[in-house]
């Protein structure tokens, strides 16, 4: 799993979980990942670009996997700002990612095709009622 080495650090506390999940995906020859809730990724601090490791960096890790296996990552987020930011820090994977600005429930209802791995990580944290209605 050398293709994930850039993501293995002490701040990425969910790395081992992602690594184990993707090992299983490789064994099963999975190529299609669908993710609800796009990682926000890099943040700008003065002139430094820093990764926001609190997100777990799911979007770039799944994109790296998609590149490795010749697959595709479909990711959706209700926030256009999050999608646009993710597009910037994953630009080298653009042929392996399809971004969608959409409510996750609506996105999944309309998704056509096989899903090998479904990663549910969307939440309306600012609105607990909307989050409970999502039930994701």
Language-model segments: which ranges?
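A short alpha-helical cap/connector motif
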Residues: 1-136
């Amino acid at each position: 799993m050398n293709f994930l080495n850039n993501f293995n650090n002490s701040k990425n506390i969910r790395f081992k979980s992602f690594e184990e999940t993707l090992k299983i995906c490789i064994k099963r020859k999975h190529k299609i990942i669908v993710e609800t809730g796009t990682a926000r990724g890099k943040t700008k601090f003065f002139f430094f670009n820093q990764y926001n490791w609190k997100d777990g960096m799911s979007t770039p890790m799944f994109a790296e996997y998609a590149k490795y296996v010749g697959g595709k990552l479909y990711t959706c987020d209700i926030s256009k700002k999050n999608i646009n930011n993710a597009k910037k820090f994953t630009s080298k994977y653009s042929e392996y990612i399809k971004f969608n600005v959409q409510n996750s429930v609506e996105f999944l209802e309309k998704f056509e095709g096989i899903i090998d791995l479904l990663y549910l990580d969307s939440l309306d944290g600012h609105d607990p009622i909307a989050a409970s209605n999502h039930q994701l």
